[in-house]
């Protein structure tokens, strides 16, 4: 197995395994636990997305990478819905406070903002052809929303003191940020080189 696949599996698998061994689970109900792990998986999927679109995962062609990016995006939406629905079932007042930005917890607004950005990207992806969005326009819209998703998701995760183990959580968040910065830098470099090539003609 190529090292990058092994590193990806560890970056996502270790935090999940560490959370599964948390003593705090003893005081949590099954729905709350499901919601929590859906949140961890969602952050793991956020890590996969830039790796796919940047073509960094060996064995995947550009076409397969884009297709996988779309499917992982759908899985991310499902994970977020399970996360939010589970928390709503276990504590409706807390979720109402979070969704209305009235929660006293510092991590709530970042999670809510990231959630709406994820839903916005998913909706636009579904309606892209109907709206007649060109690839360039789609990227202009998608990139800022992706940044919001990454920043909001990472801050939401880091500020929560829950079942996730501190070090593995920090490593996962750092990996998400690093992958996002890497793909953005590479895309910017490609556009710059393409612009220079066109200007020379």
Model-found features: residue ranges?
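Membrane-embedded alpha-helical bundles that constitute the cytochrome b-like, heme-associated redox core
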Residues: 1-201
């Amino acid at each position: 197995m190529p090292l990058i696949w092994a590193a990806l599996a560890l970056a996502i698998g270790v935090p999940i395994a560490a959370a599964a061994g948390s003593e705090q689970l003893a005081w949590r109900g099954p729905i709350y636990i499901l919601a929590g792990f859906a949140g961890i998986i969602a952050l793991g999927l956020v890590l996969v997305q830039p790796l796919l679109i940047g073509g960094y995962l060996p064995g995947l062609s550009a076409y397969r990478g884009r297709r996988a990016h779309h499917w992982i995006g759908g899985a991310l939406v499902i994970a977020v819905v399970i996360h939010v629905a589970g928390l709503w079932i276990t504590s409706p007042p807390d979720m109402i406070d979070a969704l209305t930005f009235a929660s006293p917890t510092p991590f709530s607004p970042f999670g809510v903002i990231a959630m709406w950005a994820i839903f916005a990207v998913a909706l636009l992806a579904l309606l892209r052809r109907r709206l007649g969005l060109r690839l360039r326009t789609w990227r202009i819209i998608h990139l800022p929303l992706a940044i919001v998703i990454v920043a909001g998701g990472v801050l939401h995760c880091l500020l929560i003191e829950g079942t996730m183990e501190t070090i593995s959580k920090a490593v996962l968040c750092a990996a998400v940020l690093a992958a996002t910065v890497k793909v953005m830098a590479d895309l910017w470099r490609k556009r710059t080189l393409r612009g220079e090539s066109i200007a020379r003609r």
